Structure formats: structure tokens, C-alpha cells
Regions:
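A short acidic, Gly/Pro-enriched loop at the edge of an enzyme's catalytic core
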Residues: 125-136
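C-terminal alpha-helical "lid/dimerization" subdomain adjacent to the S-adenosyl-L-methionine
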Residues: 22, 165-217
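A short glycine-rich, Lys/Arg-flanked "PGG" loop and its adjoining helix->strand segment in the class I
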Residues: 150-160
Length: 229
């Protein structure tokens, strides 16, 4: 007798999606489960926003010898570009709470023979950052950016005048329902709460001077940047 597991998988997915719509704050346990399931396919799933990653890294304006933090570094897709930008005299610090995701990041930097990358396997609000940073990147890290304690801890590691760049999903204006259908579908696969999608960079604003926010993808994504006060 053949028994399909697809109904069970579908039920789990539906439960995760319903939770994201109900929750007013990120859920660490749910996020760990979500990225345990996604780790093997994450690189493929996020490939459509690679141009945003490249733009965000360019916006950091990194120079040789600088230190940069990649908050929520995931499988390490940004690490090689960041490491090359700061050179052997610089340093990259990747912070990621998912063991499955950071394992892939370790494999990536080992394959690239990078010796200037340090990985910290911890939630943002508990991460021990070993050095003061010149720059900080948040690339599609919605849940992390909604946790005030995590943002505060990461910002504390950035020197005054350091550059901070964030990208991710956001709700488009109400008159763009097709874009918001895309945002909702994409968010339900990658976050544990939809709260804050109207203003995802809210927790960054107290720390940044000269903050600029640019919309993209029909208003459904953003690139925000400024300098540490």
C-alpha cells in the first residue's frame, strides 16, 4: 500500500503560512524550522533578486582593509563579494542563526579559500561580534530587522560614520494589488511574520543619518541606506 506524504507536507506549509499572517513578531523556532527545510533550495529560490544583492554591496562602498558585517548571511551568497571588496587586509563577519544555512556558508567560503571571513552561528540579538565594523548589510532579513534587540546589538558593532544598507520585501501602495500578491507569496516562504512589511526599515531609523529609501520591483522591494550616527 502506497501512502503519500504530500498532504502532510502541505499541512505543514499551510500551518507556517497561517502563523506568519497571525504573528505580530518574529518566531525563532518557526524560523529555524523554515530555514531547515529551505536550506537545500535557498540559493535557487532567491536567485531572482541577485541584482538587488549586487546593488546593496556596491552601495556599501567597501574599501580594502575594512570590516563588514553580513547580518543574516544565510548560505553565504554575499560573502565572497564582500570578502573580495575588503581584501585580505579586511574582514567579513557573517551572522546566521540557522545551523543548516550557516553550514552551507562554511562550505562556500572553504571552496573559495577565503581566510578573511568569520561566521557567527547565533541569533542577531545574541551574536558576539568580534570587531568594530565599518559597514553592515541586511539583505532580505525581514524577521531579523523586526527584532529591536537584534538591530541594537548589530548597530552597536558599527562605528560612527559606518555605512548601513538594507534590502528586502515591502508592501506596495494599495493601488498595486498584483505587486502585493507577489510580496505576500514571497514573504510567506521566507518570514515568520508579515508585520512590519509596510515599513520594514523602521528599527534602523534611530541609528542612521541621511537615510534614503529607494523602491524597486514595482514598489514591492526596497533598498535603504544611511550612515551610523
Amino acid at each position: 500500500m502506497h501512502t503519500s506524504r504530500e498532504p502532510d507536507r502541505r499541512a505543514r506549509r499551510n500551518s507556517i503560512h497561517a502563523g506568519a499572517e497571525r504573528r505580530a513578531a518574529p518566531d525563532r523556532a518557526a524560523a529555524l524550522g523554515q530555514y531547515r527545510a529551505r536550506a537545500a533550495v535557498y540559493d535557487f529560490e532567491i536567485s531572482s533578486v541577485e541584482p538587488m544583492r549586487r546593488r546593496a554591496i556596491e552601495r556599501l562602498g567597501l574599501s580594502a582593509g575594512e570590516v563588514v558585517i553580513d547580518a543574516g548571511c544565510g548560505t553565504g551568497l554575499s560573502l565572497i563579494a564582500l570578502a573580495r571588496a575588503v581584501g585580505e587586509s579586511g574582514a567579513v563577519i557573517g551572522v546566521e542563526q540557522s545551523p543548516e544555512m550557516i553550514r552551507r556558508a562554511r562550505d562556500r567560503i572553504a571552496a573559495a579559500r577565503l581566510h578573511n571571513v568569520t561566521l557567527v552561528n547565533a541569533p542577531g540579538e545574541e551574536a558576539e561580534i568580534p570587531r568594530t565594523a565599518d559597514a553592515l548589510l541586511f539583505h532580505f532579513t525581514h524577521d531579523l530587522m523586526q527584532i529591536e534587540a537584534a538591530v541594537a546589538r548589530l548597530m552597536a558593532a558599527v562605528r560612527p560614520g559606518g555605512r548601513v544598507v538594507a534590502t528586502g520585501l515591502k508592501w506596495a501602495p494599495w493601488w498595486m494589488p498584483a505587486t502585493n500578491l507577489f510580496v505576500r507569496a514571497a514573504a510567506l516562504r521566507s518570514v515568520t511574520t508579515l508585520a512590519g512589511l509596510d515599513y520594514p526599515w523602521r528599527n534602523l531609523t534611530p541609528y542612521l543619518a541621511g537615510m534614503v529609501v529607494e523602491a524597486g520591483y514595482g514598489g514591492g522591494t526596497y533598498l535603504a541606506y544611511g550612515t551610523r550616527k
